[in-house]
Regions:
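Conserved PLP-binding active-site segment in aminotransferase class I/II-type PLP enzymes
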Residues: 1-86, 90, 162
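PLP-dependent aminotransferase-like
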Residues: 85, 89-175
Length: 175
C-alpha cells in the first residue's frame, strides 16, 4: 500500500515534463520595460523599500483590490509574518499549517514566537486536508471563552494558514 507522501510525489511527477530535472517554482517573466525600470531604480538610488516604483505599485494594488491601502513587503515570508502579527499571533500561540508547503509558512509562525502545527495534506489538491483538520480539531482541541485551545498544551490556536500548492488551490470552503 502506498503512503500519502508517495501518492503526492507521484501526482507531482505526473504533471512535470521531466520529473528528474530542476523544476523552477517561481520562474520570472520579463515581457516589457523591466530592464529600463530596474535601471531607473538604480539611477534614483531607491532600490529597496521606498521610492517611486514602490509607491506606484502599492497604489495600483490598492486600486485593483479595492482596498484603501496596500503595503509592499520584501517577500512572502514577510507578508505572512505581518499578517500573523496583525491577527494577534504571539509567543505561546499555535498556528495550523499544511504539511506540504514552502518553509516560509512555518518560519513566519516561528518569527511570531508561536508554534506551527502541521495538518496532513490531501492528494487531490495537495493543500491542507479538510477531513484531517476536522479530525484534529475534534480530538485535540476544545473551545474556551470563544477560543480554540489545544487540549495537551493549553495554548490558543489562533490562526490557520491555507496554502495553494503548485498552482492547485486548496479546498478553502472545506477548510
Amino acid at each position: 500500500m502506498r503512503t500519502l507522501a508517495q501518492a503526492i510525489t507521484e501526482a507531482i511527477q505526473q504533471v512535470l515534463n521531466s520529473p528528474q530535472e530542476f523544476v523552477p517554482l517561481h520562474e520570472p517573466r520579463f515581457s516589457g520595460n523591466e530592464s529600463k525600470y530596474v535601471q531607473e531604480c538604480i539611477d534614483s538610488t531607491f532600490v529597496s523599500s521606498v521610492g517611486e516604483f514602490v509607491d506606484r505599485f502599492e497604489n495600483k494594488l490598492a486600486d485593483y483590490t479595492g482596498a484603501k491601502y496596500a503595503v509592499a513587503v520584501v517577500n512572502g515570508t514577510a507578508a505572512l509574518h505581518m499578517a500573523l502579527l496583525l491577527a494577534g499571533v504571539d509567543s505561546g500561540d499555535e498556528v495550523l499549517v499544511p504539511a506540504l508547503s514552502f518553509v516560509a509558512t512555518a518560519n513566519a509562525v516561528r518569527y511570531c514566537g508561536a508554534k506551527p502545527h502541521f495538518v496532513d495534506s490531501e492528494e487531490r489538491t495537495l493543500g491542507m486536508d479538510p477531513e484531517a483538520l476536522r479530525a484534529y480539531l475534534h480530538v485535540s482541541t476544545e473551545q474556551r471563552n470563544g477560543l480554540c485551545v489545544n487540549i495537551k498544551t493549553g495554548n490558543t490556536i489562533l490562526a490557520m494558514i491555507p496554502v495553494h500548492i503548485f498552482v492547485h488551490p486548496c479546498d478553502l470552503i472545506g477548510l
